Amino acid sequence: MVVTFTSRRSEPVLLRPARPTPRETKQLSDLDDQRTLRYYETVVGFFRRCDGGAAGAVGAPADPAKAIRAALAEALVYYYPVAGRLREVADGGGAGNRLVVDCTAEGVVFVEADADVRLEDFGQPLLPPYPCVGELLCDAGDTRAVVGKPLLLMQVTQLKCGGFVLGFHICHNIADGFGMAQLIMAIADLARGEPAPTILPVWRRDLLTAARLGSGAVARTPFASAAAASASASSPALQNGARRAAAAADAMLSTPPDRMVVEYFLFGPREVSYLRGQLPAHLADSTTVFELLTAVMWRCRTAALGYGPDLRVRLMITMNARGRWNAHTPLPRGFYGNAHVSPVAEAAAGDLLGRPLADTVELVRRTKRGMTRERMSAMVETVAQLREWPPSSMDRVYEVSDIKWTTVNLLKFGWAEFAGGGIPLAGDLTSKLGSDHTRCKNSAGEVSTVVSMLLPRVAMARFKKEMAVLLNKDDKKSLTIMSSL
């Protein structure tokens, strides 16, 4: 039985930094300043009280919400741009106004709430989708309007068991997933009693700009010619016409939101082992779980959407530039801006579906491992020119992100431990068109991966049939955890 509840919320307050902070204007990187990132990302995190962490125990606050509020105000002293506001400035480049951050210390939104439910009521194990998730988040208004608004909105919901839920909206132009996690980790550090965040924040957005990385390189990706076409089609009428044509040809763009459905697919060790068994030995041993599941999801999605065999389909893989692969352009520890680059794989739909799974896995691996400094520079240059990625002329694009490692060993309050969470089906729906790979534990306590998938309702039924064939499962219901509309 799915639990239902209503949270009792306090009035929202604007929480300012605990001490005076610099008043200045900060520039964003070219990756930060994408029009496609002008929205609020939504994240929820569930926490349980540690043993001995009941109210009144040494080190455990009687009121977690007030402790987190004080820690957030202190964290904003270090992350003071987050307490500011975005402003548009004219840009002569023809791609529209740029954003800058005015560090005004106006503050972020904070809400305290209570709910008459326990942590275990959200499910055992704790897996998405989360019931009544809207009750765990404060109202962000229009999540596509970011100029002149608070950049962070946080709600702390206290549960009957002593646990609590952090629910927040944060403007994606300010931080990516790792940056968001770093900010929340700083709050946890300070709530635990540390004198300063374990990792001090670094702004340095100039490191990911075309001016810094520019090499004049041409992006050798399937998007190169289309990116050039997007740049040359400066007429709004031409751009709007191209978008309408793409939407008409792609059910992902033409289906109304009320006819879409999100489902979450759980892959434990047994499912992953079965899929590896369909690969040659050399590939089965070296392929990561992310690469394997990405290939599987892309194939099933392509089949479910019924693309013609000659149509080109694309896979866009979000990669973290803080990773070991990026030894050529290292980012300093503490960098919390957008540092994701997104190489693209492309294939004809008929070829993708007609060839063995191993070929798709190989394509995914080549795409990931082909992200050189030259390609990274070319992508940043393209983003600087178009202010978006992928170019709006692209269609039939499936984006995947691996966020399994953003919460590992993070969020240690001392008196509370992270129990689960991630990106829920709430807030801006257009940001949920891709798939997120999240780490969790299944009912047997085994480390597993949950992958989200948003599709038109009719296509979802076909998707589950394709997945059942790959996993050799008769019961398609056993493939998913639960669906969300």
From Swiss-Prot:
Family matches, as Gene3D superfamilies: Chloramphenicol acetyltransferase-like domain
Entry EC number(s): 2.3.1.-
GO biological process: defense response
Cross-referenced InterPro entries: CAT-like_dom_sf, Plant_acyltransferase
Keyword annotations of the record: Acyltransferase, Plant defense, Transferase
Described purpose of this protein according to its UniProt entry: Involved in defense against pathogens. May contribute to disease resistance by potentiating disease resistance signaling, or producing phytoalexin-like secondary products.
General remark: The gain-of-function mutants Spl18 (T-DNA tagging) show a lesion mimic phenotype, express constitutively PBZ1, accumulate the phytoalexins momilactone A and sakuranetin, and display enhanced resistance to rice blast fungus (M.oryzae). Plants over-expressing SPL18 show a lesion mimic phenotype and display enhanced resistance to bacterial blight (X.oryzae pv. oryzae).
Family: Belongs to the plant acyltransferase family.
PANTHER family the record matches: ACYL TRANSFERASE 4, OS10G0105900 PROTEIN
Designated name of the protein: Acyl transferase 1
Name of the gene encoding the protein in the UniProt record: AT1
